[in-house]
Amino acid sequence: MPSLLLIEDDDAIRTALELSLTRQGHRVATAASGEDGLKLLREQRPDLIVLDVMLPGIDGFEVCRRIRRTDQLPIILLTARNDDIDVVVGLESGADDYVVKPVQGRVLDARIRAVLRRGERESTDSASFGSLVIDRSAMTVTKNGEDLQLTPTELRLLLELSRRPGQALSRQQLLRLVWEHDYLGDSRLVDACVQRLRAKVEDVPSSPTLIRTVRGVGYRLDPPQ
């Protein structure tokens, strides 16, 4: 049974989502503020965090940043509007996905399960790209022999690119493969995740040699020369 931490200040929304997600088979702990949510996170280890953007005191963006300093738990943001700035800031803060309110419990449940599947083990082979080694059995990535701390979404994106070295994948292809949804052209999810992934796997993230941008298409993972 997946365990969730729901951080939402609106009592009605928090209660409704807690009830719906519990009925869907999740164990749900709740907090009404960012401070309380961070305290709960120190006391228990959820499988995933559902985090409202507009919180009293510490907002959802800052909560997300603080979590990402020490933890790679998957995070889904709840935002009241499909605002470009809110979405971009949220994704750059380290969120794996976002859902626009109002949201039905079963829709959020589908997103949660899709995010959790990204960390599931798959094939038993490994792949090497220079100093970068991807172990698909252990679901680990090392660079120069040191473990990299990737979120489930970052790991899944790297796995999908590594299956097709040298092949360009469009943003829409990556949305389907990694996020399991067509977001009506919302390539910001892909671009933000690539940016975070490059910061961890590239020697010089501003001049990437592994994860290359294919102009007008998307991205590819290049084997080292």
Swiss-Prot record:
Phosphorylated by AfsQ2. It holds the Pfam family Response_reg. Residues 124-223 bind DNA. GO terms for biological process: regulation of DNA-templated transcription. Keywords: Cytoplasm, DNA-binding, Phosphoprotein, Transcription, Transcription regulation, Two-component regulatory system. Residues 3-116 form the Response regulatory domain. PROSITE patterns: OMPR_PHOB, RESPONSE_REGULATORY. GO terms for cellular component: cytosol; nucleoid; protein-DNA complex. The keyword GTP-binding does not apply. Transmembrane segments: none annotated. The keyword Phosphoprotein applies. It is found in: Cytoplasm; Cytoplasm, Nucleoid. One of its GO terms (molecular function) is transcription cis-regulatory region binding. Its main location: cytoplasm. The modification 4-aspartylphosphate is found at residue 52. Forms part of a two-component regulatory system AfsQ1/AfsQ2 involved in secondary metabolism. This is Transcriptional regulatory protein AfsQ1. It comes from Streptomyces coelicolor (strain ATCC BAA-471 / A3(2) / M145). The gene is afsQ1.
